[in-house]
């Protein structure tokens, strides 16, 4: 006797716990459950996936993996990687740490001068954004070893406005304060009047 359709079955993959509940990119996440040896991929919020080849360890009851820098807060998904995959969602959202943007100084600054940004977990910052959409990537600012301070040169064409941090996960972290850029003022030109091909001198504040 033969059946008309193939008989298939699947193991009851389950998630019992995900720890720690709050985690920073680069740290090891532990997932406990059953039949986890069948999992080929762990998917974080917004489709950020870690394949089993990158797992730190895996058994039937537990998976350990490092959280990728692109990961964002949200539920995680376990997938068996089949053509029609079995996907199991965590009950609770995983809280992925973002940079904390405490303050910046000075709040009034001349373009070309150095701005100091303070906070926590600033090693997760990929870019600093100034008013006018001026972006400074991480290879153009300095970060202290504690990850609590960034020093960045204000672009010459930066506008007044907010200073934002762009995390490596793509999330924008705001501070709420406004940066004011100092422009040249009190300008004077000598000699006045002037003839063609004559050298002039411009004086003023914040030149």
What are these model-derived regions, one by one?
Residues 1-207:
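Ser/Thr/Pro-rich low-complexity tracts
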């Amino acid at each position: 006797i033969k059946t008309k359709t193939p008989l298939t079955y699947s193991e009851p993959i389950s998630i019992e716990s995900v720890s720690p509940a709050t985690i920073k990119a680069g740290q090891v996440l532990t997932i406990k459950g059953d039949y986890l040896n069948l999992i080929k991929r762990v998917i974080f919020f917004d489709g950020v996936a870690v394949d089993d080849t990158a797992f730190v360890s895996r058994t039937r009851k537990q998976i350990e993996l490092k959280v990728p820098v692109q990961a964002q807060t949200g539920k995680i998904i376990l997938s068996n990687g089949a053509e029609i995959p079995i996907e199991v969602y965590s009950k609770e959202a995983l809280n992925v740490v973002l940079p904390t943007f405490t303050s910046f100084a000075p709040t009034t600054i001349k373009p070309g001068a150095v701005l100091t940004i303070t906070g926590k977990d600033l090693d997760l910052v990929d870019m600093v954004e100034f008013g006018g959409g001026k972006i400074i990537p991480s290879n153009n600012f300095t970060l202290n070893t504690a990850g609590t301070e960034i020093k960045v040169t204000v672009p010459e064409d930066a506008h007044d406005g907010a200073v934002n941090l762009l995390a490596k996960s793509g999330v924008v972290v705001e501070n709420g304060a406004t940066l004011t850029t100092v422009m040249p003022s009190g300008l004077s030109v000598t000699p006045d009047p002037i003839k063609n091909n004559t050298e002039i001198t411009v004086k003023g504040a914040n030149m």
